[in-house]
């Protein structure tokens, strides 16, 4: 009998083609290594990407184009940098993640009042992307269009907290009840659905209620630094053997624990014998390895609002996540701009080290959590802005 495979809610990034002079990335690309391609060429402040330990400039590890479902005008990308100094290989603040956004112009917001203007605006916005083939177009049967995260083309958008096309399939989340952060994000999603009847209301929803920061008046030039070899990533949905869907997880979801809603699996953490058992910690790593084995060349896992795949339960981060299930303090700070909780969004996987040809790195996974409200950072005259997000690192 042939093995049956089941689709999960996670998107995976696989090595596609190397970056070259003939095939260069743009701001809508997702890739490892190389140099970042910022919106409108507006660089961030280089001081942001200095290693917190040695103060040297970090190298780009990943650029991920990550627009959110329901916000067709706001453009968004995540950038991850890492220090290449051997003495910083196990230093927590040697990895930096920045969320970059480009907000719509006032003329674009006004344009959505007219149906004809909407059509024209969408054509104008999509035309630059169509000039060359998107190397990240998903080839699975569930994909539609070039943008795998487009809310209008796919019900399987990983940026939505409810992306399961099969209601009968059990949730892959270890927590059976939603957290405060998940509720907040779901509330926004629900409002977007109910207000999607008019584009004007939709724009008001995504732009109102946000903190207004002083504009950025300085301009910056991205420094010429050494870089890792570049590789485009192709995105596809994750598939796992059907018999693994219901397997019990031992990983934790710090980012979904802002309320005391816990399922039965958390009770085991309260038992001292469980806490001290090395076999439990080993099981966390076994689950990590097993999940990777189904798609061994994955370099990126993306599931905004989902559950991170932990490599260990006994390192500092794993212990902190465990303490949260016992009502301890979360290691994930609130967004400094709007004070909202952060959501898990993505993680870099071990195979990325091989693709980057990074002989220094020793991490097992790099977790990224971002503002659950996706608040607007300070922006410049081109309406481009950057916000530093949370990074959690687990080492070998």
Swiss-Prot record:
Q: Which family does it belong to?
A: Belongs to the TSR4 family.
Compartments, as annotated in UniProt: Cytoplasm; Nucleus, Nucleolus
Q: What is its main location?
A: cytoplasm
| Gene Ontology cellular-component annotations | cytoplasm; cytosol; nucleolus; nucleus
What is the source species?
Schizosaccharomyces pombe (strain 972 / ATCC 24843)
Please provide the record's keywords in A-Z order.
Cytoplasm, Nucleus, rRNA processing
The record describes the protein's role as: Required for processing of the 20S pre-rRNA at site D to generate mature 18S rRNA.
Transmembrane segments annotated in the record for this chain: none
**Highest taxon in the source lineage:** Eukaryota
Pfam families hit by this protein: PDCD2_C
Record InterPro entries? PDCD2_C (IPR007320)
Keyword Cytoplasm present in the record's keywords: the answer is yes
Supply one GO BP term.
maturation of SSU-rRNA
- Mind telling me what this protein is named? Probable 20S rRNA accumulation protein 4
């Amino acid at each position: 009998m042939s093995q049956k495979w089941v689709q999960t809610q996670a998107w995976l990034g696989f090595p596609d083609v190397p970056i070259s002079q003939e095939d260069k990335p743009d701001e809508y690309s997702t890739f490892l290594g190389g140099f970042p391609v910022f919106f409108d060429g507006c660089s961030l402040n280089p001081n942001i990407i200095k290693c917190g330990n040695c103060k040297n400039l970090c190298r780009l590890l990943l650029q991920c184009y990550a627009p959110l479902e329901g916000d067709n005008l706001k453009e968004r990308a995540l950038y991850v940098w890492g220090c290449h100094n051997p003495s910083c290989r196990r230093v927590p603040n040697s990895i930096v993640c920045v969320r970059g956004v480009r907000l719509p112009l006032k003329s674009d917001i006004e344009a959505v009042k007219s149906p004809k203007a909407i059509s024209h605006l969408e054509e104008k916005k999509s035309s630059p992307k169509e000039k060359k083939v998107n190397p990240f177009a998903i080839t699975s049967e569930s994909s539609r269009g070039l943008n795998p995260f487009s809310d209008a083309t796919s019900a399987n958008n990983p940026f939505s907290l409810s992306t399961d096309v099969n209601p009968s399939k059990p949730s892959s989340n270890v927590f059976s009840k939603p957290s405060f952060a998940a509720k907040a994000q779901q509330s926004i999603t629900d409002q977007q659905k109910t207000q999607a009847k008019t584009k004007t209301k939709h724009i008001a929803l995504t732009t109102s209620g946000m903190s207004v920061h002083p504009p950025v008046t300085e301009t910056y030039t991205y420094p010429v630094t050494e870089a890792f070899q570049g590789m485009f990533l192709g995105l596809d949905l994750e598939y796992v053997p059907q018999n693994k869907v219901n397997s019990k997880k031992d990983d934790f979801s710090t980012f979904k624990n802002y309320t005391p809603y816990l399922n039965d699996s958390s009770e085991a953490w309260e038992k001292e014998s469980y806490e001290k058992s090395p076999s439990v910690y080993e099981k966390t790593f076994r689950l990590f390895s097993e999940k990777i084995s189904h798609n061994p060349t994955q370099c990126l896992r993306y599931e905004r609002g989902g559950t991170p795949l932990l490599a260990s339960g006994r390192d500092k981060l794993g212990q902190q996540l465990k303490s949260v299930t016992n009502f301890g303090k979360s290691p994930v700070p609130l967004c400094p701009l709007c004070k909202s909780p952060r959501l898990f969004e993505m993680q870099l996987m071990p195979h990325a080290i091989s693709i980057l040809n990074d002989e220094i790195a020793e991490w097992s996974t790099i977790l990224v959590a971002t503002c659950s409200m996706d608040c607007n950072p300070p922006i410049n005259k081109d309406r481009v802005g950057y916000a530093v997000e949370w990074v959690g690192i687990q080492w070998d």
